[in-house]
Amino acid sequence: MTNKILITGASGFIGSFIVEEALNRDMEVWAAVRKTTSRKYLQDKRIHFIELDFGSKEQLKAQLGEHEFDYVVHAAGVTKCLDKADFRRMNTEGTKHFVDALIELKMPLKRFVFLSSLSVFGAIHEQQPYQDISEHDMPRPNTAYGKSKLDAEKYLDGIGNDFPYIILRPTGVYGPREKDYFLMAESIKKHIDFAAGYKRQDITFVYVLDVVQAVFLALDRGMSGRKYFLSDGDVYSSTEFSDLLKKEMGVKWMLRIVAPIWVLRIVTFFGEKLSQITKRPTALNNDKYNILKQRNWRCDIEPACDELGYHPHYKLADGVKLAVEWYKKNGWL
């Protein structure tokens, strides 16, 4: 019997790759979308579409009531908003409404995978030598995004083991179709590389297909209530990503500008004010300031490796090469 899977955030960067892998596994794939959602990466005719309104539990129950899903991957969410309250409304309350609807409908789920983020921990272990952030550490999110994801995690934790959920906490996810790291590529194409802060920064990354690998491992064998960090297993300096972009793009030279943290604070302050005027979300906001200010992004992926059988296949050099090839092929660069 074919397994039926519902994927929220299906039109997004990570979600669209999850859809593709589910199709490769011959699952019956249902992609949760909004009326205004672009379906550019959801062209396969085997995909079923369902419109979901995460703002209302009762509306979700009506929309989901005629369906039975074996698996759910909740990848929907927002990473930047005009109003900080929207993070909670969409990432926290939206998740709560969704889970409550599934429970009240007695959805016969085998597993529910929630895509959270390393950002739920914020700036901890910031004194050198930096230590890996582990599941035993106390989260102290320093961004509105991280707090909204942590609050969603806490809600899931409060439900109990009757709801079979697994939480994945990827570090910075990059790859084809991703737009935020792409901004770095655009800047380097113009021979400019911008960094903030003079203190050593340890950064981690995970290629999008390794996140997808972890999602399906969690669906297959994840223990309810467990949480797993995801990275490629290595730690990088603050310049390695841009150096690899420069190499793969064939840029012969670039000017590396390292600004004090206080300059970044000014830039993001005015970026946020401009966003409020134009009514368009921007990556240059207070959350971005706290993200770039943070020095330690190490995380412990051993539990994911030991319990799920997760083994990252893409080191940063491999992933950047593939991402740049895609950017060029699709006319982004």
List the model feature ranges, each with a label.
Residues 48-93, 97, 118, 122-123:
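NAD(P)H-binding glycine-rich loop region in Rossmannoid oxidoreductase-like domains
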Residues 96-144, 166:
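Conserved Rossmann-fold NAD(P)-dependent oxidoreductase catalytic core, especially the SDR/UDP-sugar
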Residues 218-284, 317, 321-324:
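Mid/C-terminal beta-alpha module of Rossmann-like enzyme folds, strongest
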Residues 208, 243, 267-311:
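Conserved C-terminal active-site "lid" loop/helix of NAD(P)H-dependent oxidoreductases
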Residues 299-307, 311-333:
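Amphipathic terminal alpha-helices
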Residues 5-25:
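N-terminal Rossmann NAD(P)H-binding glycine-rich loop of SDR-like oxidoreductase domains
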Residues 140-166:
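Active-site Tyr-X1-5-Lys
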Residues 151, 178-183, 196-219, 225-226:
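Substrate-positioning beta->alpha
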